[in-house]
Amino acid sequence: MDRGAAAAQGTAPPQDGEQPAESPEPPPPWPPPPPPPAPPPAPPLLSEASPEPIPEPCPELAPGPCPEATSESATELYTEPTPEPATEPASEPAPEPATEPAPEPATEPAPEPAPEPATESAPEPTPEPALESVPEPAPELTPEVAPELAPEPTPEPVTELAPEFCPEAAPEFRPSPAPCLLQCPVDTRERGLKTSPSPSPSPSPRTPMSWSRIKKILKEGPMLKNCNSFKRWKLRYFLVQGQKLYFAHHPAFAHFETIDLSQATVAESSCRNLCHSFCVITPQRKITLAAPNRKDMEEWINIIKTIQQGEIYKIPAAENNPFLVGMHCWYSSYSHRTQHCNVCRESIPALSRDAIICEVCKVKSHRLCALRASKDCKWNTLSITDDLLLPADEVNMPHQWVEGNMPVSSQCAVCHESCGSYQRLQDFRCLWCNSTVHDDCRRRFSKECCFRSHRSSVIPPTALSDPKGDGQLVVSSDFWNLDWSSACSCPLLIFINSKSGDHQGIVFLRKFKQYLNPSQVFDLLKGGPEAGLSMFKNFARFRILVCGGDGSVSWVLSLIDAFGLHEKCQLAVIPLGTGNDLARVLGWGAFWNKSKSPLDILNRVEQASVRILDRWSVMIRETPRQTPLLKGQVEMDVPRFEAAAIQHLESAATELNKILKAKYPTEMIIATRFLCSAVEDFVVDIVKAWGQIKQNNTAIVSVILKSDLMYDRLSVLIDVLAEEAAATSAEKSATEYADSSKADRKPFIPQIDHIAKCKLELATKAQSLQKSLKLIIFQVEQALDEESRQTISVKNFSSTFFLEDDPEDINQTSPRRRSRRGTLSSISSLKSEDLDNLNLDHLHFTPESIRFKEKCVMNNYFGIGLDAKISLDFNTRRDEHPGQYNSRLKNKMWYGLLGTKELLQRSYRKLEERVHLECDGETISLPNLQGIVVLNITSYAGGINFWGSNTATTEYEAPAIDDGKLEVVAIFGSVQMAMSRIINLHHHRIAQCHEVMITIDGEEGIPVQVDGEAWIQRPGLIKIRYKNAAQMLTRDRDFENSMKMWEYKHTEIQAAPQPQLDFQDSQESLSDEEYAQMQHLARLAENLISKLNDLSKIHQHVSVLMGSVNASANILNDIFYGQDSGNEMGAASCIPIETLSRNDAVDVTFSLKGLYDDTTAFLDEKLLRSAEDETALQSALDAMNKEFKKLSEIDWMNPIFVPEEKSSDTDSRSLRLKIKFPKLGKKKVEEERKPKSGQSVQSFIGNLWHRRHREDEAEGDDPLTPSRSQL
């Protein structure tokens, strides 16, 4: 009996729409058994599926995966049709009978009525032709045999598993030891089908087809499903096939529920989404699922969103998926106030769970309304419509408007009235510059988007292109040479580790996509930094922001090395990891405060200054393991080696003579192989006898001379092979070219025959043997004493290459002589470091294995011993249980526990016996210690200044990250590391040097860590030397304070009320003299505006003055030239007005006085970092100041320059209030803070502990707003 009938014992089909009953035994692992049988097909549907009566249908697999199907890529799921469906299975023995009596014969003609299944679980009936693929009848078929069971879709076991679905006569069987991976749902239209009563002896001529050839399984796997029951979350098995989602209790079930995904949308469950859950929304139902991890969840979402475009057989990655262009990225959210749906325009109540929001464009929608949402998310280069594409010589960017749902304090950029409404969806907001305007004012607003304050960091979507059409965006070449200052002077590339910071990186991803171009924000867990660096590498300069820990920073810097972009980019760090030592040193703080907006990061990065960070290569040369001699090989003494070496030399000479006298290519090839074999045997004998050779100087000299002779024979061989190859190729090329020219005049392409290929391979092998002999000679010389080395130096390569040559042939350039000269030059070009690193004990290794290799690059610190052991244990535990290490506080607690454990174990209490230290070539005598730390920065292990202080002493210089020096520190135990967090220790300093060499002795490895990444280092040498320097962005707090001070002054200037004239005075016209003065002031203002516009293209911080510049330019154009200006410098092309009223003069003067005050405050705070530009700007301001003094002499103009002061009574009352209450409060606070007698020791210890952490907390906080007294 076939295995398809055996599945009926483990699983039975559900009745009347109930859930399928689980197997009485827990499902064992793979390979799974086939699904349970189902009723035979009914005659009516059979006639629809096939025009001819089919006597015996092959059971068809449900539209799910086969037992061998996995959740791998969908491209691996194609299968070939099975030409022999009745092939006998070989891998499924049936030694034990396990039959089940069938209640009815398989040939019963009466159809059995089908039960009432769920309509959504019905798959598409396309694979009906599979019913014609059975060549022989099966009278033992029971009524439960399902016609939906089709042959396996995987290609390898097709011939083996096909009989499972084509029943044969078998009296007994044994069930398969594992359930099927997945079976497809049972179609309700096919559930009543039964087999034909009259079997046909002849097979059908049609080729059998499987479900997997029609619809591929795009993804499958287990997920948790929210069942709205007591347990809520239950494990189910899911798969996506075609445009449908199938799920069941277990992959072995034959009956699956079905969800149609042709009209569906997906929304994540929350903003941070720690549970990796998402909701699939269709017009009929909503289902909430939870994936094992975020990567798996994003793959499901990517597939579900992609197949809405149709049945797609290859799903691209989400980052480069052209099918997702313009689609919204929804997640569930709620608001404390009423919102409005951007699709149906209806209101969304406050705290409603039915609201979802797009993480990029912040569009709101009901869940069901999202099905009808248009694909108008924030633009990238692929989603811009044709009418928005601009010519290549323009960098202008249009606005992208979103209607309604304004922030509370929104104001119209045109009329400065409030925008938005709680009652309806009205007014518009630009996604790029965040400007809000009324619908009526939008036509009067500028058509060009200026990106507001962050325009220097944003890449316009018009500047990107997709030349290959694969979603890999690059900066268009048409925009490289344009003036990017108005839109993108120094763009910002953002890399975020979404797992860092207790999944705070997810919030950063969404926020930065809202503030910037979504195409310039990358998740490091999705392909790493390669895609972002490839897109930005054509910019002359750009900035990089890494949101993560020290490991993420090292990852990005290593890719910058590979791309060679250190001269172009500057890197800033936002601390989201555990230690964040580099971020502390660069001034970005110990951690990021979750209560702060990520928008502050953009301001700080744009105001940061550049500092150089030294980077160091960690070079490793491991001591190769002593490999025992092969079976049959024994160690050789010196006499035996001498005899064997002479035989090898004679054999090599004999074979070389055969090569020189060979008449046929085959003879040359055979002799060359024997010559190479003789050289290999010679090298192996040296390895065997080296233990005896290195104790005898005479034997060492003999090895050098014999190796020299072998090297000379190989040089002759290589020259002969080169001459033969050149002559043969020239002759053959000429012959073939002549033949081809006579034939059809096609272009000639030379071909390499078998003999030429063999000669080429032998020449390559001979060159490799030459390198080995070269290494042997130089290493053997190192074993000689000084006297013998001086004696043999003349007899080495110098005697071989020059002294033995005939003086008459010195000027000749024979091939042999050329080869020798080339070899000598290559030997002389070897570095002394390579010669010192060779070891003849390990010649059976390749030369590369006994040289230094760069293991990694150090940015922060290097540790060996105790601290590396703690870091290694922590990393091992985190890899095993990632859920327990998802927060910064937990990680610090684990570090403390592991350090306490080492306090008791003292694993490396005698490390100085196994480790030797050299600093700048000088051997350092080590005390009794447990670890060594090499510092590049002044922060170690989460904020410890392990060097002790940042000041210089008589013995050591002050440490710095750009001084080209390393600080070496000793670790005596866990207590010392703990005390270093409280007080500065100095007694454990070892050295300050430019290069460090550490030797590890013994046979066991020692833990080593670089920047928190630890591993077990085998015995050998570790060298730390300078590699290169990186440009890092450090937080400039002085500049930030100056900018805040300017912003405070700017706010006061803008808040100053404009003086008002009497109605009669306001209507009077200016005199000729007054009008001339106003015209002169306007010209000076135009000069200042022009200078500020030019400086804004060079200095990005000047952009804060553009608001005052635009306002002054507009009022000059409106009043002096009578035009509605959107252009700052449009006055030159207009006809000036002949006279002005006093009211207009007051408006112009007040606006220009505001621009003057803003610019003066900008220079007073030293915000312009260029002395030459500051001098030019100051001269323009001085000219305007002189004109203001002349205008202040006019009586009706004086209130503008001398504002009214407040009355003395108000000031005195205000002063008394300011002085009286703070004194009482201060006295009370001092009394409360006065320590009691029993708390003095506790207070001292607490203050001592918290003193180390106050600086980090202060770094994360913004400085206080400057008071009026400071101004």
Curated annotation (Swiss-Prot):
Expressed in testis, and to a lesser extent in placenta. GO terms for cellular component: plasma membrane. One of its GO terms (molecular function) is zinc ion binding. Residues 1-15, 139-149 have a biased composition (Low complexity). Phosphorylated at Tyr-78 by some member of the SRC family in response to H(2)O(2). Sequence repeats lie at residues 48-51, 52-55, 56-59, 60-63, 64-67, 68-71, 72-75, 76-79, 80-83, 84-87, 88-91, 92-95, 96-99, 100-103, 104-107, 108-111, 112-115, 116-119, 120-123, 124-127, 128-131, 132-135, 136-139, 140-143, 144-147, 148-151, 152-155, 156-159, 160-163, 164-167, 168-171, 172-175, 176-179. Residues 48-179 are annotated as: 33 X 4 AA approximate tandem repeats of E-P-A-P. Pathway: Lipid metabolism; glycerolipid metabolism. GO terms for biological process: diacylglycerol metabolic process; intracellular signal transduction; phosphatidic acid biosynthetic process; phospholipase C-activating G protein-coupled receptor signaling pathway; platelet activation; response to oxidative stress. It is a peripheral membrane protein. Residues 1199-1268 are annotated as: Required for localization to the plasma membrane. Residues 216-309 form the PH domain. Does not form homooligomers. PANTHER family: DIACYLGLYCEROL KINASE, DIACYLGLYCEROL KINASE KAPPA. Diacylglycerol kinase that converts diacylglycerol/DAG into phosphatidic acid/phosphatidate/PA and regulates the respective levels of these two bioactive lipids. Thereby, acts as a central switch between the signaling pathways activated by these second messengers with different cellular targets and opposite effects in numerous biological processes. This is Diacylglycerol kinase kappa. It comes from Homo sapiens. The gene is DGKK.
